[in-house]
């Protein structure tokens, strides 16, 4: 077996740490460089991960330096944020170094710019998989698997729900209160919900004001919530990989309603040009921190995702829904993608999304191997089919 070296960007962060723990379990990985700017945190993570890990002080924005570092590794795995600051420099550095690459990218606008680097990556012999986490990532592959249920598909809808306050929100507010750090995940939420956003209708992308296009959705608990279109990479990549599908949308609902109003109030300020994404996120976290008793009481399950497709099977119209169960993870798919590339199982070269290069079921089964023991008896995903 060929022993390989991994450069993990964002190695001191939440997602990077868990990806590192998965990667070091593989005999194929001989070394993993945890890269970032916070040297003290990196040293702490190295001690936690073990003998295969070492720290690599580097600023992702310094593309030349990062490319020089990356040349010594077999793959660059990017779990750093915020995404609009880290994804493009990291991908460019990997291409310059001639090193394979994968990331957690969930910013649609950045994903489009990454895809523009496809020819450069091919010229350098680089395989670069973008957006391979939970969503995007697992959901893209669920779509490819679900397409087999139909003879033809009319519409694909990605439904995202964020039930708050969850554990990650509490972490974000605590970090803001103690160090004024503005959580990059919440910056991503603000960036994705601000208008205008795109939907894919009748084979074309069109821009809409999300608050003018709300739809009522029945949630898993039977309640009805209003969901709004949201900008997401799935909306960009699925139509490219499945051109026969002419309608794709991503919709998003936040509960409770008071939290949703607060998020969209800040998002509208961004859209009007009054504040930046980071400033809006800071204002949002400040509001929560000032009145914890109101905003942060109780504990909600957090993020939920499901895919709903309508189409035709044997001459009958049907609606199919599917959702992750045992494969509900962000960091594990990133690690599995890296290992798949390192094994040589991705023959393509260029920049592409996961649905273009991974076989869904075998990928899901490998992800499931890294899930906690208490989840091993659960199904990989849930599904339902309704004839219309």
Where in this protein do the model-derived segments appear?
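N-terminal Rossmann NAD(P)H-binding glycine-rich loop of SDR-like oxidoreductase domains
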Residues: 6-22
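ADP-ribose/adenylate-binding Rossmann-like module
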Residues: 93-111
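Short beta-strand element of Class I
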Residues: 31-33
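N-terminal Rossmann-like NAD(P) cofactor-binding module of classical short-chain dehydrogenase/reductase
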Residues: 73-79, 101-102
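Rossmann-fold NAD(P)-binding glycine/threonine-rich loop
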Residues: 105-127
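C-terminal catalytic/substrate-binding lobe primarily of soluble NAD(P)-dependent oxidoreductases
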Residues: 149-388
